Structure formats: structure tokens, C-alpha cells
Design a protein with these regions (language model features):
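Short acidic, Pro/Gly- and aromatic-enriched capping/linker segments at domain boundaries
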Residues: 96-102, 414-419
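A residue-level signal for beta-strand positions that form part of recognition/binding surfaces
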Residues: 33-35, 93, 154, 332, ...
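N-terminal, Lys/Arg-enriched amphipathic/low-complexity engagement segments
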Residues: 28, 32-88
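An N-terminal, globular interaction/scaffold subdomain
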Residues: 58-63, 98-101, 105
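Buried, small/hydrophobic-residue-enriched core segments of structured protein domains
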Residues: 1-31, 40-42, 78-79, 84-93, ...
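Short coil/turn segments at secondary-structure boundaries
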Residues: 71-72, 140-144, 158, 455-462
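Gly/Ser/Thr/Ala-enriched C-terminal appendages of enzymes
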Residues: 2-30, 43-45, 283, 288, ...
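Hydrophobic residues within beta-strands of alpha/beta enzymes
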Residues: 197, 262, 290, 312-314
Length: 486
């Protein structure tokens, strides 16, 4: 279900509009190419998960300046009446290409490409980055947490700690894409048609005369899904014994609980879970689940798994929904080509003293190269959009910075897949977005195409993003031209 049926046109940085007015006054209407990409995987990860495309689509569809928008801009006393009149009739007429949501992606490759008249392409920069950066960050962080859980279910529990309602809502969406099995966020469940999950709070226990009574009444209310929070008073002396007592009473009454277990929210989770597991098993409840929460992240999960914690379900909140240790994604939006009067795209390059900030010029696309035998990703290849490749021929891959690092793939041993697909054509959306659940399933398949060495939490193997020979030659020529001796 679409959420952003709202107009976000003014959700932009002021300088986008001041530049637009400058282009308008100069009569600049040429078509340009902008690329969205990032330079480093967040959290030291070996890959990222791109997300947020569906919200970009909604944003572009609803892009228009209302009377109130124009009136507000007039009140700033920055913009001339003729430019404001132009904005009154503004709508997006360009093309957008993007990598599908849920794809694994790597630094410096275009996640999204805008081809549009300069004023249109300039305006959409800020909001596209806002939408892609946030959800890609949370989807990537979630992937790390899911990896650390090693097959256990991860529930997204972060709404109350998110940086505002939008971050909570779209963070939950991104978390499902990244691999969470459900969310506590009821609005996210409604809007995105994803599973909602939860247990109860300590306050539930505290409002009853005693813990046993609270547990029993909760089990009577929810016999099909009953997880009892056992650490309000004393986990091993009170909480677990009272939970077992309730489970046994329902079993003896011929009404055994269908899906049931306990939740730990404090203390030494490894120690308590192993003790609780032993108590549950000895009481005849080996199928009772043990869920844990309490400021978890991928590192703590990794350690708890290594210590043999008897936990099979995890509620992860603050560290996931805020990506606490790596709170930004770093996506950028850079001009890469301008179309001339002959309809040809002239490559443009941004040069920097910092090598990693030098951009890749031209109207480009990306091909993912897979090892045919295993289906695993070998590399990504950035090339000009009009380049084609023959999988029956040898393919030379080389590092664009350390060009002596080369790999030749023999024809017939690899396959290639173009990653950028058309989303908008001449201002019209031509793409049908999959559901969030479908994106999550696709993301799981995408991660299966990664080597285990790339998925590990610590010092992951790098997936190379290479340039075609033609693109490399053009980039080198532009750099040589810019640094020509006087």
C-alpha cells in the first residue's frame, strides 16, 4: 500500500530552488544525467541493501507546487514572479532508472539514475537522497543483525526509540526488507501488509496482585500466541516457575497453548536462557520458545550465539531502528553527463584532491557478473549505457584504481545481468512495485548470491566494482585533460 500520497515538493534544500531559478533565468533547459551512489558500506559491511525506491516513486508522482507552496516561496522575497509562475505548472518529465529494492549493492555504483531537464533533475536531489539513504541504511543494518542471529527470527521493536514517526514507520519497512520476520509497529503492519508481533510489558505484570495471576489471565486471552515476560521480579525463582505453572495448567485442562514461550529482557541473557531452557525442558515443555530483547545489536547476538545462549527469537529495537553505531548511509547525487544539441551525452567528471571523490563520467549502467557454476557474484561492472557484452566471449575485469589487478573470465563461465531498470519514462511511471514481503524474499535471494566471506561481520571480503575499458579510457582522458600542463 502506498503511504506517501502527500506532496513532498518543498521537502528540499533551498539551494535546489535558487539554482533552479538561475537555470531558468539563463534559459538552461538541457537534459542532464545525475547518479545516486555511495562511497562506503555502512558499519564496515561487505555490501549494502538498497531500499526506499517505492517512496521515491510516490514522491515523483506527487511532485507539483501547490498554490500554498508558491505563495510561501513568494514570501521569502528570493524568487521572481516569472520563475514562480513556471513552478506553478511544474511537473516531472524525465526518465529514472534504478536498481530494484532489496538488491545487494556496492560502493560507487549508481543505485538510481535521473535523466531529465536540468531544473527537474536538480530539484529532486534532496528528497531522493533522503528516502534512499535512510531506508538503505536500516535495511543494511538489519541484514547484519539477521546474519548474526544465524537463522533465528528477528523482530523489529524500535518504534519508541526511532528519531520520529517517519523514521519509525519507514525504518520498520526497511527492516522487513533486510530480513526481520515482523515488527511491533502496528501502522507499518497496516500500511505495508507485514506481520506485527509483540508480547506484553512489565506494567502488565505489575497491575495484577501477583505474577502468576497476570500470566494466567494473559494466557486465557491469547492461547494461540502466548509469550510471557519473566523478568519483572526474579527470572529463575519467580518468572520461569510461574510461566511453567500456567503452561502446565492449560495442558492439564486439555487446552494446551498452541504457540507459547517466555521473553527475557534483562540480566545475563546467555546464563538465564540456558537455565530457563533446562527448567522448561524438565517440566515437559521443550517446544516453548525463548525470546530475548534488551539493547541488542549484531555484536551482542554474535557473542550470545557463541556462548550457546538458548534463545531462538530476538526483539531488536534501538540499535536497529537508529543504526546506532553507523547512523548515516552517505549517498550522494552527482552530475555525470549533459546532452548536446545532437542528442549525444557528453561525459562530465567531478575532480577532487581526494581520489575516492572523483566521479565516474557519462550515461552509465551496471552489469552484475556471476560465476556460472555457483551463481555467486564475481564483480559488478560499470559501463556506458549503450555498451553490450557477449557472455560467450572472454571478459577482462580490472581494478580502476590499481589497474594491474586483473581477472580474465573465460567465455561461457560467467553470466551477466543489467541492474538498472527503467522506472519512469517521459515523466510516467512504467514500473510496478512489488509488495514489501516480495521485496524481502527477493533480498534473501540476493544475499544468497554473495560469498560467505562477503557476508561476515568482521573484515568482510570486498566485491570489486570495475569499469569497462571504454569507460575507464574516457575517465582517464578527462582527468588528463583537466591536469594538462600549462
Amino acid at each position: 500500500m502506498s503511504v506517501t500520497a502527500q506532496n513532498l515538493t518543498l521537502l528540499t534544500d533551498l539551494y535546489e530552488l535558487t539554482m533552479m531559478q538561475g537555470y531558468y533565468k539563463k534559459g538552461q533547459h538541457e537534459t542532464v544525467v545525475f547518479d545516486v551512489f555511495y562511497r562506503h558500506n555502512p558499519c564496515g559491511n561487505g555490501y549494502s541493501v538498497c531500499a526506499g525506491l517505492d517512496q521515491v516513486i510516490d514522491y515523483i508522482k506527487n511532485l507539483n507546487f501547490t498554490y500554498e507552496d508558491v505563495d510561501y516561496l513568494r514570501s521569502l522575497h528570493i524568487f521572481d514572479d516569472d520563475f514562480l509562475q513556471y513552478l506553478s505548472g511544474f511537473h516531472f518529465t524525465g526518465d529514472i532508472y534504478a536498481i530494484p529494492e532489496g538488491s545487494v549493492v556496492f560502493p560507487k555504483e549508481p543505485l538510481l539514475k535521473v535523466i531529465a531537464p536540468i531544473m527537474e533533475a536538480q530539484l529532486v536531489e534532496t528528497t531522493i537522497l533522503n528516502l534512499i539513504n535512510h531506508q538503505s541504511l536500516i535495511a543494511t543494518k538489519t541484514s547484519r543483525v539477521v546474519y548474526a542471529a544465524d537463522g533465528d527470527g528477528i523482530m523489529e521493536f524500535g518504534l519508541r526509540r526511532a528519531q520520529g514517526p517517519d523514521a519509525g514507520l519507514y525504518g520498520a519497512r526497511a527492516a522487513i526488507i533486510g530480513g526481520c520476520v515482523g515488527t511491533s509497529n502496528v501502522l507499518a503492519g497496516q500500511l505495508f501488509d507485514v506481520p506485527v508481533m509483540g508480547t506484553h510489558a512489565h506494567s502488565w505484570i505489575m497491575t495484577f496482585p501477583d505474577e502468576y495471576t497476570a500470566f494466567k489471565y494473559y494466557a486465557e486471552l491469547y492461547p494461540d500466541n502466548c509469550t510471557l515476560l519473566v523478568d519483572t521480579y526474579d527470572t529463575l525463582k519467580s518468572g520461569v516457575p510461574n510461566a511453567i505453572r500456567v503452561f502446565q495448567e492449560f495442558k492439564d485442562a486439555g487446552k494446551p497453548l498452541k504457540k507459547y514461550g517466555i521473553r527475557l529482557d534483562s540480566g545475563d541473557l546467555a546464563y538465564l536462557s540456558k537455565k530457563a531452557r533446562k527448567m522448561l525442558d524438565e517440566a515437559g515443555f521443550p517446544d516453548a520458545s525463548i525470546c530475548a530483547s534488551n539493547d541488542l545489536d549484531e555484536y551482542l547476538l554474535h557473542d550470545l550465539k557463541a556462548q550457546g545462549a538458548a534463545i531462538n527469537s530476538w526483539g531488536v529495537g534501538t540499535h536497529l531502528i537508529t543504526s546506532k553505531d553507523c547512523p548515516s548511509f552517505g549517498g550522494v547525487y552527482k552530475l555525470s553527463a549533459i546532452k548536446n544539441e545532437n542528442g549525444e551525452f557528453i561525459p562530465k567528471i567531478k575532480i577532487s584532491e581526494n581520489t575516492e571523490k572523483i566521479t565516474n563520467p557519462g550515461n552509465k549502467t551496471i552489469y552484475r557478473v556471476y560465476e556460472k557454476e555457483t551463481g555467486k557474484i564475481k564483480a559488478d561492472l560499470i559501463c556506458f549505457a549503450d555498451e553490450t557484452f557477449d557472455e560467450s566471449q572472454d571478459l577482462l575485469l580490472f581494478d580502476p584504481l590499481e589497474t594491474w589487478k586483473k581477472t580474465k573470465l573465460a567465455g561461457g563461465t560467467y553470466t551477466m545481468r543489467e541492474m538498472l531498470i527503467p522506472i519512469f519514462k517521459n515523466g510516467e511511471c512504467i514500473y510496478t512495485s512489488p509488495s514489501v514481503t516480495e521485496i524481502a524474499e527477493y533480498c534473501k535471494q540476493e544475499k544468497d548470491s554473495l560469498w560467505d566471506e562477503t557476508k561476515r561481520l568482521f573484515y568482510p571480503h570486498r566485491v570489486y566494482v570495475d569499469l569497462s575499458q571504454r569507460l575507464y579510457d574516457v575517465k582517464k582522458a578527462l582527468l588528463d585533460q583537466a591536469h594538462k600542463p600549462e
